Amino acid sequence: MITLAALQMKSESGDVAANLARIGQAAKEAAGKGASLLITPELGLTGYGAGDVIRDLAEPADGPLVRRLQAISAETGVAIIAGFAEKAGADTFNSAVYVDGPAEPVVYRKSHLYGDYERTLFTTAEPSTMLFTHRGVKCGMLICYDVEFPENVRRLALADVDAVLVPTALPAGYSGTFIADHMIQTRAFENQVFVAYINHCGGDERFTFAGSSRIAAPDGSLLASAPSHGEALMVVPLNPADFLVSKSENTYLTDLTRRA
């Protein structure tokens, strides 16, 4: 079992220092509430709508920004998932990093870029299964649009993860409302995993965000939800053992791979 903190955040566009400070503040608050892992939104460190400046702010996965996240994690005792622009040679990836103090970071690169805005800024990564175990709970990461493809969540479920953790930048509108209110719980139920889907709130010079962050359980129930407006820090326990009955009743993964 772990206690997860999830920050629905108003990022400052192009202001990495301010966003890093906000994440540090949230990590301290999460520690005070007994959480051991904090998840934050897609590109939360640069701001999602910062445009071309995002490429200028990109850093390698072993750069000073990730090292600062590691320091915050070590200071607070809280592991952190943060979205950043990752520089790798000539490529810039839309990435999320998991840091747990001085341990080796785990980096996931977004494999399904959404729209011309993202495709202009970032290189498309190959679909990948980047896993880590946090305090005994096996986790995988996706980013925003990735979770809208059931194949991506199913791939992680077949790798036996307990939780799928999804930094996102979901725009406001009908589609955003549908995704938050229906798709996230469905992804959790059909794969019998926790799904944490953590969004921005407010807006920037290009986008208005839906807020509406969600944490869903393997039985499809909603463990926590954030409002459509304003920041929120949700703190919830994730205990796979609480949902063994659901897994025994809903044997999708077993039956999918069953041989006649």
Predicted segments with their positions:
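Short polar catalytic/cofactor-binding loops
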Residues: 8-13
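CN hydrolase (nitrilase-like) catalytic-core segments centered on the catalytic cysteine
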Residues: 64-79, 148-232
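Extreme N-terminal starter segment of soluble prokaryotic enzymes
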Residues: 1-6
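Short beta-strand scaffold segments in enzyme catalytic cores
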Residues: 82-84, 95-98, 130, 197, ...
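Structural motif
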Residues: 36-37, 139, 163
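Cys-nucleophile CN-hydrolase/nitrilase-fold catalytic domain and related Cys-dependent amidase chemistry
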Residues: 16, 24-107, 171-186, 190-193
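Active-site catalytic loop in hydrolytic enzyme cores
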Residues: 61, 87-159, 172-182, 239, ...
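Short, acidic/polar
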Residues: 18-27, 147-154
